[in-house]
Structure formats: structure tokens, C-alpha cells
């Protein structure tokens, strides 16, 4: 095994992304999930900016401040830093994340993540979104490896299925407490133990 490829939401950070709708509905309780999701998904695929999301939803005033107040509610997953420090000098590391360009940049700078990763594939930058297999294949190509050399960690079964389809070794980080028939862990301590036991990472 030569590389570890990680999802962002629900893996590197605690929040799975499912908190955005209720966060918005605190201010706009009458907005439907669909009305919130439509601009959000457009930003994730790079069709609009993240600031356009807040404006479309109905927020007014200093949109950058409003956005940063939301992003500052997001926290790193427990044990992530310890995990990444253990593997950073032994294996290539990559992120594949469905996110707007601005949100991803803000969070990566906030948590000083860029220094850890050889490849960072963000849907808003690439205009490719999981579960489109092209974002996986592009990441593998940028790593300069074969798919079978890569472990992929995500909290969503659909993304893991695509990773497996292209030849990566999928692992569920079960931050959302879902049922999954494949290889799964509950935290980064378990992930370290699993990759050592099953994939030979030491």
C-alpha cells in the first residue's frame, strides 16, 4: 500500500455536512431542504461561489462574516492529527472532497491541512463531484500510482462503492452510524490498527 486517500466531511472533520440545513433553518425556518440544497450543490460543483449560496438563500449583510461564522462551527475529528502525523512521512496522502472552493480553502488553512497532503481534489475546483468516478481516477493519476495501491476512507457507502469499482481499497469511517457490509472503523485509532493488520502499513 502506497497511499491513503481521505474524504473531508465525516472523516477529517467531525461534521458530515448534514448540519448545514438545520443551521440555515435556524434563520430561515420556512425554507425547505431542497431550497437549501440546490444552491449548495451548485457551489460544490463550481457553478456558483459559496457566497452566492448565502445570498441565494436570503442572507444579507457581510456574507463573508456569515460564512466564516458557520465554518468556524466545524471541528477536526478526534484523533485525526495523531493519525496523520503517524503516516505522513511513510505514504502519499490525498483528499477527495465534495465542497465549494472557498469553504475547502478556508477549512484547510484554518486547520493547517495543506502541509500533509500530496494531492487535494476538491469538487468545486475540478467541477467533478463524487460519486463521479473521474474525480477518483484523476486523484490516482496525480498521485502517480495504481488504484490498487490506494486506500480510500469515506463515511458514505456510495462513494466507497465507486472507489472499489475503480480498484481502490475502501474503508468506511462510520461517523454516521450506518450499516455497511465492507471494512469499517469507528475512529482513527481503529483505522491505524486496521491498515496495519490488513494492508501492511506500519
Features from the language model and the residues they span:
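Short alpha-helical
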Residues: 19, 75, 102, 157-158
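A metal-dependent, Asp-based hydrolase signature
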Residues: 40-67
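Short hydrophobic segments within beta-strands
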Residues: 7-8, 96, 153
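Asp-based, Mg2+/Mn2+-dependent phosphohydrolase catalytic module
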Residues: 2, 100, 108-202
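Short, acidic loop-to-helix structural element flanking the phosphoryl-transfer center
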Residues: 51, 65-94, 105, 133
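Active-site neighborhood of HAD-like aspartate-dependent phosphohydrolases
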Residues: 1-38, 56-61, 165-166, 180
